[in-house]
């Protein structure tokens, strides 16, 4: 009787081993589930970034507002007879490069 119980206990352990530690076991499934969740989160972040970039591309293609804004903030350009005022944070290092307006020399009178 004792031998039968030991054999049955050994069989139960052998049957449980692949369930917990095998190729398709619970631990592997749990790990893969966490990998799927992480990949979905990263995909959602990338989709949001792509939507933002797509919106910016459409704005650059269809309107002049975005081009003018980039010219002002990134290149320091302004339109003729326009005054552009930008308030900078004194604690933040500026990456803005100011380009002075061209010097127009008065025409000579003949």
UniProtKB/Swiss-Prot annotation:
The keyword Membrane applies. It is found in: Cell inner membrane. Residues 1-3 are cytoplasmic. Keywords: Cell cycle, Cell division, Cell inner membrane, Cell membrane, Coiled coil, Membrane, Transmembrane, Transmembrane helix. The keyword Cell division applies. GO terms for cellular component: cell division site; cell septum; plasma membrane. Residues 22-110 are periplasmic. Part of a complex composed of FtsB, FtsL and FtsQ. This is Cell division protein FtsB. The lineage of its organism: Bacteria, Pseudomonadati, Pseudomonadota, Betaproteobacteria, Burkholderiales.
